[in-house]
């Protein structure tokens, strides 16, 4: 009998990607985050679709339409909070996924890595535009501050900002276009994720040792389907705990005040997952310099394959590089904390030191550590 999953044109693609895919036998739970990100994306698209059915992208009604969703729509509150906290879960998974890639040298797969960086940028843009939609105080002022950064671009800056705004300030036109973009972007992310997977399946997965696993492969199903199912269960458990017990834990109280262009909130800050980049932006006194540092803080990931000086791929057997990696993690946590603090002493200097440390670690200290480790056996 001919097996349909191996012959049918559509089933064949699914089979080769999720069923008969040869996978390394030793990939740990750090390899679960790819599938978890897929689940997050599907969840965000579904909850977002139902929210869009009741949301109105007009400055006069946006805030009240979100209130209406929470109060009057059947299970609207749970859909809204699953969407808001789903974004946080998405970014937790993203950061862990990227961190895994850095630790185990997954960036050696150039195409997969670069598409991943584009995915990160697209997700950040989508999340930013989504944060503007409820039209609360932090939505409005966050949009104003972040879009205004583009005015630092020489010569075309001001025109560019007004073009994005669709006027001379963040207003109705801005909200409408942000809603349109926020709706379309997740589908672009789906397409990019498929390209990401396509490139990954060209090379096969990396594994914790960083050594070729061609000699020891196992089928993806049932081994990793069951492992991913457990990961999904834990992800949904964590999300529902957040949604049902502390839905506003990661949000900003200011966003429960309708947007008012005449009243600036005391501390304008983005959602927690952007705070590290926001801290880097604020740590540089010059506006253009700050914007460049902000972009470079993410774009620097593209340089990772070029900065890889070690003879080994993974940091599994490289203790000095491991120390550097965990110092980088601590530094990013410090930046996240600083991004949420007011601009005053001692936070300013801590932010500046942490920002310098961030770039120093990636550009200088980590490649140096690798070079030292390469030469250690000679000593």
UniProtKB/Swiss-Prot annotation:
Output the GO biological process annotations, alphabetical, semicolon-separated: mitochondrial electron transport, ubiquinol to cytochrome c
User: What GO molecular function annotation could you give as one example from this UniProt entry?
Assistant: ubiquinol-cytochrome-c reductase activity
User: Where does the source fall among the domains of life?
Assistant: Eukaryota
Any idea which UniProt keywords this protein has? Electron transport, Heme, Iron, Membrane, Metal-binding, Mitochondrion, Mitochondrion inner membrane, Respiratory chain, Transmembrane, Transmembrane helix, Transport, Ubiquinone
Quote the PROSITE patterns the UniProt record gives.
Answer: CYTB_CTER, CYTB_NTER
Please tell me whether the keyword Nucleotide-binding is annotated for this protein. Answer: no
> At which positions is heme b b562 bound?
83, 182
As to how many cofactors bind and how, the note says:
Binds 2 heme b groups non-covalently.
Q: Which residues bind a ubiquinone?
A: 201
Question: Which residues participate in heme b b566 binding?
Answer: 97, 196
Q: Where in the cell is it found?
A: Mitochondrion inner membrane
TM ranges: 33-53, 77-98, 113-133, 178-198, 226-246, 288-308, 320-340, 347-367
Gene Ontology cellular component annotations, sorted alphabetically: mitochondrial inner membrane; respiratory chain complex III
**Topology term for the membrane:** Multi-pass membrane protein
Cofactor dependence is on: heme b
Question: Which Gene3D superfamilies does the protein's record reference?
Answer: Cytochrome Bc1 Complex, Chain C (1.20.810.10)
Quaternary structure note: The cytochrome bc1 complex contains 11 subunits: 3 respiratory subunits (MT-CYB, CYC1 and UQCRFS1), 2 core proteins (UQCRC1 and UQCRC2) and 6 low-molecular weight proteins (UQCRH/QCR6, UQCRB/QCR7, UQCRQ/QCR8, UQCR10/QCR9, UQCR11/QCR10 and a cleavage product of UQCRFS1). This cytochrome bc1 complex then forms a dimer.
- More details: Heme 1 (or BL or b562) is low-potential and absorbs at about 562 nm, and heme 2 (or BH or b566) is high-potential and absorbs at about 566 nm.
Main role?
Component of the ubiquinol-cytochrome c reductase complex (complex III or cytochrome b-c1 complex) that is part of the mitochondrial respiratory chain. The b-c1 complex mediates electron transfer from ubiquinol to cytochrome c. Contributes to the generation of a proton gradient across the mitochondrial membrane that is then used for ATP synthesis.
- Record family assignment: Belongs to the cytochrome b family.
Question: What is the recorded name of this protein?
Answer: Cytochrome b
Q: Which organism is it from?
A: Damaliscus lunatus
């Amino acid at each position: 009998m001919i097996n349909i999953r191996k012959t049918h044109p559509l089933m064949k693609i699914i089979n080769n990607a999720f069923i008969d895919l040869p996978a390394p036998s030793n990939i740990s739970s750090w390899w679960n985050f790819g599938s978890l990100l897929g689940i997050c994306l599907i969840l965000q698209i579904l909850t977002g679709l139902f929210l869009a059915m009741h949301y109105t992208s007009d400055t006069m009604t946006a805030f009240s339409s979100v209130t209406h969703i929470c109060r009057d729509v059947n299970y609207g509150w749970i859909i809204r909070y699953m969407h808001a906290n789903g974004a946080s879960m998405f970014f937790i998974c993203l950061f862990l996924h990227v961190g895994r890639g850095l630790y185990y040298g997954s960036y050696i797969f150039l195409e997969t890595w670069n598409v991943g960086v584009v995915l990160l940028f697209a997700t950040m843009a989508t999340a930013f535009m989504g944060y503007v939609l409820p039209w609360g105080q932090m939505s409005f002022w966050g949009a104003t501050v972040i879009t205004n950064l583009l005015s630092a671009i020489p010569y075309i800056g001001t025109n560019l900002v007004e073009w994005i705004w669709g006027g001379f300030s963040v207003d109705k036109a801005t909200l409408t276009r942000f809603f349109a973009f926020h709706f379309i972007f997740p589908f672009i992310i789906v397409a990019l994720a498929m390209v990401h997977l396509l490139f990954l399946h060209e090379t096969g997965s990396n594994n914790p040792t960083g050594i070729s696993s061609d000699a020891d492969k196992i089928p993806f199903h049932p081994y990793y389907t069951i492992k991913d199912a457990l990961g999904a269960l834990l992800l949904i458990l964590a999300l529902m705990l957040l949604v049902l017990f502390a839905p506003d834990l990661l949000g900003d109280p200011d966003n429960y005040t309708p947007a008012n262009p005449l009243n600036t909130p005391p501390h304008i800050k983005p959602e927690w997952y952007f705070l590290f980049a926001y801290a880097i932006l604020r740590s540089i006194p010059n506006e253009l310099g700050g914007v460049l540092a902000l972009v470079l803080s993410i774009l620097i990931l593209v340089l990772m394959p070029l900065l890889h000086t070690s003879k080994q791929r993974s940091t599994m057997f490289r203790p000095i590089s491991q120390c550097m990696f965990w110092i980088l993690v601590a530094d990013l946590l410090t930046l996240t904390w600083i991004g949420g603090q007011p601009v005053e002493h001692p936070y300013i200097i801590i932010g500046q030191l942490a920002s310098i440390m961030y770039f120093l670690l990636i550009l200088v200290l980590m490649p140096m550590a690798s070079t030292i480790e390469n030469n250690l056996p000679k000593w």
